[in-house]
Design a protein with these regions (language model features):
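PLP-dependent aminotransferase-like
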Residues: 102-174, 184-191
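Short conserved active-site loop signatures built around small residues
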Residues: 1-28
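Basic, Gly/Ser/Thr-rich N-terminal segments that form RNA-phosphate-binding interfaces in CRISPR RAMP
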Residues: 181
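Solvent-exposed alpha-helices and their adjacent loops that cap or buttress functional pockets
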Residues: 17-22, 77-79, 100-101, 130, ...
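ADP-ribose/adenylate-binding Rossmann-like module
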Residues: 194
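Conserved N-terminal alpha-helix of the aminotransferase class I/II PLP-enzyme fold
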Residues: 26-27, 32-92, 96-100, 117-126, ...
Length: 194
């Protein structure tokens, strides 16, 4: 039981105005919003007024409520220090994270057993020289030993990039799609952070 945790049993207290006194949040089923004046439009698009929604694919009361509730569940008393983002698909989430972290000429070391869409994104976008020119490596195996061997090989092969300040990013999916293999994420993470 966390102080300040906005929940009563299985029913959270929603920050969604339409859900006041409701057991579940209201679902916003619109793509566009009306504004009373042009000043409100400008405030919304410049981020000065967070209660003015612009377009449902950007943000809407339903997705904001979901994100805030996830933060409450995950962070408890420290929820006010965190935020969450919702994505409409797993691929959107993967690309959102990668496009934020990966820079031109960086290095990605990925487990070989990943979803086909993830493979295409890494191979056909990030690794293309006309795009980001990322050096893409794959490792077989499921534990920290297999990963450690692959990481040392990548460091040896990409010595020049590393000297230029490029970073190695590790991409894992576990359980792996489509076979369901489970990786030793904790062990691989320990090696990656050494």
């Amino acid at each position: 039981d966390y102080p300040g945790f906005a929940s009563k049993g299985a029913y959270p207290i929603f920050d969604n105005v339409a859900a006041i006194f409701s057991a579940t949040p209201g679902i916003t089923r619109t793509a566009t919003y009306l504004f009373a004046c042009t000043e409100w439009v400008e405030d919304a698009f410049r981020g000065r007024e967070l209660l003015h929604d612009i377009y449902s694919r950007l943000m809407n009361p339903t997705s904001v409520s979901l994100a805030n509730h996830i933060v409450d569940l995950e962070c408890g008393a420290e929820a006010n220090q965190y935020m969450a983002w919702n994505f409409n698909s797993g691929m959107a989430a993967i690309d959102g994270i990668l496009s934020h972290l990966v820079g031109r000429d960086d290095i990605i070391l990925s487990s070989r057993n990943i979803y086909g869409g993830s493979f295409q994104l890494l191979h056909d976008w990030y690794a293309k020289s006309a795009k980001l020119g990322v050096a893409l490596y794959w490792f077989d195996g499921y534990d920290q030993k297999a990963f450690s061997i692959a990481l040392e090989e990548v460091k040896k092969n990409e010595d020049e990039r590393l000297k230029m300040g490029r970073k190695i990013l590790v991409y894992l999916e576990s359980p792996c799609n489509p076979h369901g293999y489970v990786l030793d994420v904790a062990g691989i993470s320990r090696v990656a952070h050494q």
